[in-house]
Amino acid sequence: MWMLAVALLHSISHGILTENFLSHHAFPSLLLSLHFSHPSVFSEDLHASLYFVNASLQEVVFASTTGTLVPCPAAGIPPVTLRWYLATGEEIYDVPGIRHVHPNGTLQIFPFPPSSFNNLIHDNTYYCTAENPSGKIRSQDVHIKAVLREPYTVRVEDQKAMRGNVAVFKCIIPSSVEAYITVVSWEKDTVSLVSGPRFLITSTGALYILDVQNEDGLYNYRCITRHRYTGETRQSNSARLFVSDPANSAPSILDGFDHRKAMAGQRVELPCKASGHPTPKYRWLKDNIPWEPDSRFRQTVTGLLIENTRPSDSGNYVCEVWNNYGTAEMIGRLYVKQPLKATISPRKVKSSVGSQVSLSCSVTGTEDQELSWYRNGEIINPGNNVRITGINRENLIMDGMAKSDGGAYQCFVRKDKMSAQDYVQVILEDGTPKIISAFSEKVVSPGEPVSLMCNVKGTPLPTITWTLDEDPIVKDGSHRISQIITSEGNVVSYLNISNTQVRDGGVYRCTANNSAGVVLYQARINVRGPASIRPMKNITAIAGRDTYIHCRVIGYPYYSIKWYKNSNLLPFNHRQVAFENNGTLKLSDVQKEVDEGEYTCNVLVQPQLSTSQSVHVTVKVPPFIQPFEFPRFSIGQRVFIPCVVVSGDLPITITWQKDGRPIPASLGVTIDNIDFTSSLRISNLSLMHNGNYTCIARNDAAAVEHQSQLIVRVPPRFVVQPSDQDGIYGKAVILNCSAEGYPVPTIVWKYSKGAGVPQFQPIALNGRIQLLTNGSLLIKHVLEEDSGYYLCKVSNDVGADVSKSMYLTVKIPAMITSYPNTTLATQGQKKEMSCTAHGEKPIIVRWEKEDRIINPEMSRYLVSTKEVGDEVISTLQILPTVREDSGFFSCHAINSYGEDRGIIQLTVQEPPDPPEIEIREVRARSIALRWTMGFDGNSPITGYDIECKNKSDSWDSVQRTKDVSPQLNQATIIDLHPSSTYNIRMYAKNRIGKSEASNELTITTDEAAPDGPPQDVQLEPISSQSIRVTWKAPKKHLQNGIIRGYQIGYREYSAGGNFQFNIISIDTTGDSEVYTLNNLKKFTQYGMVVQACNRAGIGPSSQEIITTTLEDVPSCPPGNVQATATSPETISISWSTLAKETLNGILQGFRVIYWANLLDGELGEIRNVTTTQPSLELDGLEKYTNYSIQVLAFTRAGDGVRSEQIFTRTKEDVPGPPAGVKAAASSASTVFVSWLPPLKLNGIIRKYTVFCSHPYPTVISEFEASPDSFSYRIPNLSRNRQYSVWVVAVTAAGRGNSSEIITVEPLAKAPARILTFSGTVTTPWMKDIVLPCKAVGDPAPTVKWMKDSNGTPSLVMIDGRRSIFSNGSFVIRTVKAEDSGYYSCVASNNWGSDEIILNLQVQVPPDQPRLTVSKTTSSSITLSWIPGDNGGSSIRGYILQYSEDNSEQWGSFPISPSERSYRLETLKCGTWYKFTLTAQNGVGPGRISEIIEAKTLGKEPQFSKEQELFASINTTRVRLNLIGWNDGGCPITSFTLEYRPFGTTVWTTAQRTSLSKSYILYDLQEATWYELQMRVCNSAGCAEKQAKFATLNYDGSTIPPLIKSVVQSEEGLATNEGLKMLVTISCILVGVLLLFVMLLIVRRRRREQRLKRLRDAKSLAEMLMSKNTRTSDTLNKQQQTLRMHIDIPRAQLLIEERDTMETIDDRSTVLLTDADFGETSKQKSLTVTHTVHYQSVSQATGPLVDVSDARPGTNPTTRRSAKTGPTARNRYASQWTLNRPHPTISAHTLTTDWRLPTPRPAGSVDKESDSYSVSPSQDTDRARSSMVSTESASSTYEELARAYEHAKMEEQLRHAKFTITECFISDTSSEQLTAGTNDYTDSLTSSTPSESGICRFTASPPKPQDGGRVMNMAVPKAHRPGDLVHLPPYLRMDFLLNRGAQGASRDLGLGQACLEPQKSRTLKRPTVLEPIPMEASSTREAQSWQPGAVATLPQREGAELGQAAKMSSSQESLLDSRGHLKGNNPYAKSYTLV
């Protein structure tokens, strides 16, 4: 079957498909696809592509000396074939050595000499093509042009300008090379100019000099050009600028433009510059419409700048210029071209064969363009199925696309020399029909319906037909055909047979065909029934081809099918093939003689039955033409060509065609046909007969053709003949010659020189002589020797050559043949200049001087002319020459054919002008000069002489430097001395002579770094981190200027080390200097050097000196501290030693600090042990106790840092005896035993054992009680029998000691007894507390509770908060502070009673600490504080909070409870901070302290008055000296500098973040006053400085000061004087008024500050008094001396005001003493209390405090709220500062009330205490007077003095005396001052003098106590000599000092008054002791007060403010009473300050 398909395809491919071929043959199950075959130029592979790599390449210009390489701008994938063509379409070829195309498509043109120039190669248009299977594209036209090297010169002309105006220099370039030349730079003398403020180089190459100055005329100006392609540079001549003084003149345009072309999107500058005075103004118009500035248009110094140009910007631009004296305008046209752009749409075209494709090409950038379409590189012309529509042929429409139409389509747009293109690839899919699915072969029975389907795909939609055994299906009732089109575009056809018959069997075929091809499918349908053969049609076969014969069998089944010919079974040869299964016979390569005949098909139906049918095959032979060709013919000849058909069946028809069409009769062609031949005859051949001739032969079998081309050759002939011509010398001439012929003839020119007999020679073509494409000869530059005969010869190898000659006559225009380019003349002498002219006569010669014709009337000029041969010689004489004659002279020669000129530069030489000398740079030992050469006398400068001398010397002793090179314009004078003044001048010399002396300069050299080191450098260590360095300045002659400061270099000294020095810079203070280095390493050896500094730098360093810082305490704790309990009383401790770098000295040992952590949360006594070893065993410890342990190292300087606490518990031991035992009978047989736990548990109590025994007999009973039980009932005892009872505690270590043995007897009438013990009960506040009272007895006793109130017990109040349980316990809920006190429980029955007393102590949160500032630095603040009352619970720690001023953000730090100071680091310099402190105890955090404020050291910057701001000033620069800025102790954060010309409003800003030593202001205006302002900031603030300065004139002179002169008339003098007087008086009055207002404001502010402090004190007083108020009896107070105490750092100021009398009535008394806060549980030593009552005379308004470290306007001691005071105080006296009250009112009555609650036992010693009394006002709603304590840890005398000064400023304290105590360190002072202090917290706050300074006596404020509790109050008394042993050391010494100074009587009185018991509670008040001044004893006697006595206190005269008073404590009384004797105190001295 496939063989049949191949045969069918072969037949169709040859175009021979007979009409009945398919209808007579059946092919079972055969699928055939028939394609119309066409040559394809486009692949269907979508991955193939073409593209451009440089589509913008349109022009290549190169130099003939370099050649060029031009790559083809197209490429593609897969790789493409690249070819180059000329614009005419001719493919180029290689020309050896001239042109070559590389394999990669690069076109190379080699370098060539001018004589080898060829237009076709070196100046032509090319294009290249790229071709691959995707198609073929062509590039845009590329114009390749070679530029020949041509000599040229450029020149610049002199210009004139007015000073302050503008000058424009232009570089004049010859027009022949102007397109290739670019101005690259300008030079001023030999220095290249750079565009700047005054010199601008425009885009066109012009030089603008703005703001012309006189010195601009002293230079020569030249332009430098470069050839764009050859790279050659040219330098123009020198031109000068003549500067004149400004004169009123109308504007004159100096620079403009005629026309300018630009591409859209570019930047264009339209120049317009004019000169005139006054300076003209400019205005631009476009198309006569004023121009409005916008973002694209901007008027600049040079003209109008247009950014991003658009085509709409094209137009006429007018630049109007005007001033007061006239106008001018410049008109130019701007052409903005839009780049050509072509765009094809759609971008992707994918279609099918036969479809329509439309392409559109849109063009931008032009309106009148030429558009053409190309397909695969070939131009597309309309016709057939191609249409090109649109106004500009922009639409391409192609119908019925064939496969060959696919490929690359391009749209080309051309306009002038621009072109653009775009391309798109058109992909054509294969639209040939394809069978997607179809029916299959099947067998059916008669009557069975059958449906056959064919699904076909193709483009365009195919047509489907059905056949049965090659016969069309006839539609009838049982045969129906239908078809549908699916969504995929497929055509589905159905053949439905409803009632199948046997005749319906056979081969069914569906055939689909469209314009792309035909496809068919066939399969056999067998219908059961008797087999038979359907009649077959005869077949015509073509000889030489294959033929298929199908046997049309119907019916099924059958046995076989066989073919016979002439009764012979086929096949019988190799060309015959029989397919038995489907009945098909194939005849290959049919032969007429053999294969023609009758063929029989025999079908075997049954074994013995067969049927047959015959078919006749006729074989026809197609024609065959014998090939023929046209020979070479020429025009006019005769032609005969035969066409012979050598084979083929007759009849044969023969026809002829020309170029595919029938031959028209008008051509005169004769055709003769005879049988199988045909001939073509032409009698007279002409060009019309050119073409392709085709002979076509046809018969019944086929039609064949043969084609041949006829080419008619034409001999050459002239179209334009040459004729004689004239040519002008130097101009171009074209010798015309044009010819035609075929092939195209070749034209050759020959030349014969002269007018004689011609002897023609070939002409060598070159760049000057070129052959044009039409054959004419072009001579670009006619020379005189070109005159002669020229012959034009034409040939093309057809016929004879033709030629024609002509004569060229060369006319010579006037030419200057000889003249001097340059010539020299000496000023004052005669000068002659000649020039020679040549050319056609007559010739006229004239002379010009710089465009001015020289006339005979000019007296100094004489012109003479003479003829010599064919030349004319003209001579110009100048008599005599002057400077102005220098310049350009020109001689002009003119005749009828042209003119010429020769330019002669005449230089008149003379001695030069002196140079203008200026300073370029001044250094310490050299001066750099720069000079501007004036007029050089038109003779090169041969050298310069420079003279220099000291200012004080004469020019006779000058140092001279001769013959400085003339190439230099600057020099440096060296070997000068720094900071010295010199005079300098110079001379210029040329060949003519020497100039005058230049201007004289006076210059002072800069300072140089000192040459000598500082002298006498000494080091003195003053602390562990400080070393004082002292030195003296270097020797005077080595200072090299003024010493501004020093640098100290220091480093850790190491003998072999190489450590770098740390540098510190300081300012100088004099010849002797001192500086202290701080923050050094402790106990470290340092090496130090000192260097002196001046403005120039740093001098040599001094010799290194070594010293060591002092020893200090260690900075780190010992490490790895470990502790282990070894026994119940010992702990073993070990640690590691410190590193050497942290010891800070010589290790003396280690100190171990330890204390017990008690069970109640309290801390035990702090102890310390020292050792020299890194281990220690602590013994004598409490058993089973948790210990805190810290270790520190100490040196000779003291203790170092403690280690972190570690905790270790000692081991368990047997417990101690129970602390107490009670036993009582509850009945006749039962007793109760109660006990207290042991005081020393020594472990965990496991149980208690109760022992009970009776002696007769001795029986001991043991009873066990649980460890948490403290009572036991012993039953079953004998009545009225005594028993011994004791108790033992038991731990894991065993039984402890037994308690005391008590006896008890069971009784029937048992009296009431309380088993609970008396004692102290401690509880936190706001908790519920149960006070137990367990009572026994028979009958059961009754219990009542009482509380001690003012010494009198009273029953407790029972309410909702207080109740008594049935067991006798007293319950207090939510216990408060006022619940503290002594409670009594009384139990009673009929037989007795018992009582216990419980002391309830309520723990509250701690009171607020008193926070002060003790030290500040620039980055840190050290705070100290005194803790307040601990609230009955030890302080557990502190929380310090801080915030920057004006900030809401607070930070916090936890602080150990043992600390009393804290240092905050890394703070901002010079900044205010706020601080608060909160204490915490076991109850919780206490009240926050008052907010205090402190400021770190540092202030805002300031400029030193001793420093000069301006270091140097010249014409355009100012150097500022910034060394004078002092940073104020804080680093500079910003530095802003602004300056502006005086009188203007715009500031020029230069901001710097750091200060350097100097700063230079550049580009200032010459001779102008400026305003300057600086702003320097640091973290503390900002400072500003303003100044004015003036720049110098260009000659170095100064300008007048800023003074406005007023010209006044005589009449106006008097009026002006009066006006001045009036203004002066007004100013004075305004000044006085302002001063008065300022004084009022200052006074008001001070008053407000005082009032604020008073208000703060008022608030504090209210707080204190609200806590301390207690009711008491009224006391009378005797007259006292007013005292005020001020706390200052470690100092006490006792402010004493005498002669103050007051009478005060006190009704409300507050009792505050040290004894109030002692241990209340210990009652062994009761003290007598002396209470002094004092009532404030007025409302308190504020405390008097030390504000030396506080911020102005703030009060560091302000308190806002009240809190419970402390319960324990240091025994040292606190110093209280009294507030300042209002003026006193009328006198009040004082009464005295003495209370002695408990007499002192005989022989007892009073407990030492201090007593204070603060009394509130009677009006409790108003603020109370209070006393405030402050403290600081600082001990400097400066702070003391500052506090003293603050106190003296207070009005009431101006006449006060101040007493202070100065402390010295002693070995025993620390121990003495801390003796007897048991409280851990207070021991840390004791004011022990640790170093020399001012003693500090401070303590916490007192805690308020119950008014009724006076058991522990102390009474001030005079100590007897025997009592001194009980006093602290300082009181002992003070008492001894006071003995003998009126002490006896007063001491006695005081002591008696205090100790004598009284029956009445009202006693006389003892005399108050007064302080005794150092200079004399007090003479005041004590007044005796009687009960009820009344005293009147007089008011102070004129007092504005009231008095303040402070009560004396016991210590103060002693201090007041002691005598001030010298030398007795071992560590203190006292002073009195007045």
Swiss-Prot record:
Biased composition range(s): Polar residues: 1882-1891
Gene3D superfamilies: Immunoglobulins
Keywords assigned by UniProt, alphabetized: Cell adhesion, Cell membrane, Cell projection, Disulfide bond, Glycoprotein, Immunoglobulin domain, Membrane, Neurogenesis, Phosphoprotein, Repeat, Signal, Synapse, Transmembrane, Transmembrane helix
Annotated spans, Disordered: 1744-1833, 1882-1908, 2001-2034
Residues in compartment: Cytoplasmic: 1643-2034
Bilayer-crossing regions: 1622-1642
Extracellular topological domain residue ranges: 19-1621
Coarse class of the protein's main subcellular location: membrane
Membrane topology, record value: Single-pass type I membrane protein
Compartment annotation: Cell membrane; Cell projection, Axon; Synapse
Ig-like C2-type domain: residues covered: 39-145, 151-242, 251-321, 339-427, 433-526, 530-618, 622-711, 716-809, 813-909, 1311-1403
Signal sequence interval, chain numbering: 1-18
Pfam families: fn3 (PF00041), FN3_DSCAM-DSCAML_C (PF25059), I-set (PF07679), Ig_3 (PF13927)
Tissue: SDK1, SDK2, DSCAM and DSCAML1 are expressed in non-overlapping subsets of interneurons and retinal ganglion cells (RGCs) that form synapses in distinct inner plexiform layer (IPL) sublaminae.
GO cellular component: dendrite; growth cone; neuronal cell body; plasma membrane; synapse
Disulfide bridge partners, by residue number: 72-128, 171-223, 272-319, 361-411, 454-510, 551-601, 643-695, 737-792, 835-891, 1333-1385
Residues bearing glycans: 54, 104, 496, 513, 538, 582, 684, 692, 736, 774, 821, 950, 1168, 1186, 1276, 1297, 1367, 1514
Segments forming domain Fibronectin type-III: 911-1008, 1013-1112, 1117-1213, 1217-1311, 1405-1499, 1500-1601
Record-level GO BP terms: axon guidance; camera-type eye photoreceptor cell differentiation; dendrite morphogenesis; dendrite self-avoidance; dendritic spine development; homophilic cell adhesion via plasma membrane adhesion molecules; locomotory behavior; negative regulation of cell adhesion
GO molecular function, one term: protein tyrosine kinase binding
The keyword Glycoprotein is annotated on this UniProt entry: yes
Record function comment: Cell adhesion molecule that plays a role in neuronal self-avoidance. Promotes repulsion between specific neuronal processes of either the same cell or the same subtype of cells. Mediates within retinal amacrine and ganglion cell subtypes both isoneuronal self-avoidance for creating an orderly dendritic arborization and heteroneuronal self-avoidance to maintain the mosaic spacing between amacrine and ganglion cell bodies. Receptor for netrin required for axon guidance independently of and in collaboration with the receptor DCC.
Assembly information from the UniProt record: Homodimer; mediates homophilic interactions to promote cell adhesion.
Protein name from the UniProt record: Cell adhesion molecule DSCAM
Organism: Gallus gallus (Chicken)
